[in-house]
Amino acid sequence: MMQMMEFSFSSPAFFLLLPFLFLLIKPLISRKRGPKLPPGPKKLPIVGNLFHMEGALPHLALKKMTDKYGPICHLKLGELEAVVVSSAELAKEVLNTHAVTFADRPETNVSKIVMYNNSGMTFARYGDYFKLLRQIYASELLSPRCVRSSTNHMEDELSKFVVKIQAEAGKPIFLLERVKSYLFAVLFDSMIGGACKCPERYIEAAKELSANSAAMRLEDFFPSVTLLPKLSGFNTVLAKLKKKIDDLLDDLISEREKIQANATGPMEEHMLDVLLKLRNGSGSETKVPITNEDVKAVVFELMLSNLSTAATEEWAMSEMMRSPKVFKKAQDEVRRVFKGKNRICASELHNLEYLKLVIKEALRMHPPAPLLFPRKAREDCEIGGYTIPVGTMVWVNYWAVGRDPQLWHDADKFEPERFSNVPMDFNGSHSELIPFGAGRRICPGIAYGVTNLELLLSALLYHFDWELPNGKQPEEIDMDEFYGSGCIRKNPLALIPKVVIPCQA
């Protein structure tokens, strides 16, 4: 007669089944005891959600995900844990409420190889070194006092910029490259007190680095696979670019050191002089040493910031050309404020109330970095009711915040008037308008960049009328984007200038 098999803790069958029972129960235990992560798409083995990032515009890909899963979304990108937030409320939690927790940066091959092992304020890990750089920027390089002292240089270079455009009146020109030349000329004035040799070499190097810094690359998502960047050839590309940048910056520094050595009396101090003084240990009580590589990293990240300013100027002109009423209103204001003058002067910029609204609206719709530079959690933290584990990479999709219909009426329309009588600025306290970031890692060059934007747009509106080439209509201007280290126009804006109020340099 058959007997029923009995399972007991001594039964061999129990021990055979035990591993299978553990495999069945483990996910339930993990789900119960593990952290409450934000929702997100299903993860594939090894690659996780990398396939969701396909396409040239990551801010749009991530916007689709948060539209589906909510304003906070968890991703697995290769070996990395990542979270994307796309609401003003959650951006404030990440950048302001938990500013110190999310003050760190993830490391990339670009930041490690080209930017001197994560040197400079943009890529530095959070700590004493970062705090020192922030202090240097705030008090020595880009303080309001430093910006005010630079306005004479800005005005002089602006007049030269206008005269060059006057010489090309009546034919189509691409504004972007001319704006970059102006911005680099102003930077070199502030950096060394005058022009440098072959400034176009620095512009090209900055553009090349920007093109190789498109968000994060596949190699960054698998940091343990050290052969990957070698096999892809990306390390070779970066090494060549690093040498090019190194040679340029070494030339700039050595030339400045020669001038300092040959000076027979007191010299006017410029940005590079301040950095070299800190490198040499003069005038600094900090315990954190400033090396020659730190100096080069700071100088080059200042150059990179010029590309963002130039892109914003082009977006602003594009939007105004698409909106003739906005263009005329801004132009009428500029010509009223500067009436009778033959050049733009910074002392009158505070009177350009409508132009300031135009710039805010341009930065809302076209932020320099649609995905704010990623942060890295320094410890476990709760955001929006979910756990963000230590080491997680966090992106704030400001492009999504700037186009959020719950925050902005008719969010895809260029409407500067939406900021009228609204006390909202770029200092990071208004999470609806944070194109320059917020919290501990807010961009230190806001005043410098915005002043240049106001001067550039004022000059273009004051001295010239503008037409589209080949009879193109305003609504035909394409607004396609290209993503590098920031977001620029895919196709450069071509316009025809007509001189109305001549300028003499």
UniProtKB/Swiss-Prot annotation:
Keywords: Heme, Iron, Membrane, Metal-binding, Monooxygenase, Oxidoreductase, Transmembrane, Transmembrane helix. GO terms for cellular component: membrane. It is an enzyme of class 1 (oxidoreductase). Heme binds at C443. CDD domains: CYP71-like. Gene3D superfamilies: Cytochrome P450. Its EC number is 1.14.19.80. It comes from the Eukaryota. Pathway: Alkaloid biosynthesis. Its cofactor is heme. SUPFAM superfamilies: Cytochrome P450. It is found in: Membrane. It catalyses: (19E)-geissoschizine + reduced [NADPH--hemoprotein reductase] + O2 = akuammicine + formate + oxidized [NADPH--hemoprotein reductase] + H2O + H(+); (19E)-geissoschizine + reduced [NADPH--hemoprotein reductase] + O2 = 3,17-didehydrostemmadenine + oxidized [NADPH--hemoprotein reductase] + 2 H2O; 3,17-didehydrostemmadenine = 17-dehydropreakuammicine. The chain crosses the membrane at residues 9-29. Signal peptide: none annotated. One of its GO terms (molecular function) is heme binding. Mainly expressed in roots. It is a single-pass membrane protein. GO terms for biological process: alkaloid biosynthetic process. Belongs to the cytochrome P450 family. Monooxygenase involved in the biosynthesis of curare monoterpene indole alkaloids (MIAs), natural products such as strychnine, a neurotoxic compound used as a pesticide to control rodents, and its pharmacologically active derivatives, including brucine, used to regulate blood pressure. Curare alkaloids act as animal glycine receptor antagonists. Catalyzes the conversion of geissoschizine to dehydropreakuammicine by cyclization, which is spontaneously converted into akuammicine by aromatization. This is Geissoschizine oxidase.
